[in-house]
Amino acid sequence: MKINQLAVASTLESGDVMIRIAPLDTQDIDLQINSSIEKQFGEAIRATILEVLSRYDVRGVQLNVDDKGALDCILRARLETLLARASGIAALPWEDRQ
């Protein structure tokens, strides 16, 4: 999936996560995580984000994640919404999910 534009998903409410994405000129993934629960769940947050990016074959992006204690399912939903917005597609290809 090609990320074409800047995008933001969600708010900074308690129990939620705000994610910002921007395209890069390289194939790197620049991931910055700021979380109120980073000491306990930072690695799990990072693993979830990288797994979703890998599933949609996303490379060459900068991600800024401001987590306020979001559950894993919320993190995934926000990230998938963000990817759709940033790639300019109306909806993700749900029929391709396994």
Curated annotation (Swiss-Prot):
GO terms for cellular component: cytoplasm. Transmembrane segments: none annotated. The keyword Endoplasmic reticulum does not apply. Belongs to the CitD family. Oligomer with a subunit composition of (alpha,beta,gamma)6. HAMAP family: CitD (MF_00805). Covalent carrier of the coenzyme of citrate lyase. This is Citrate lyase acyl carrier protein 1. The gene is citD1.
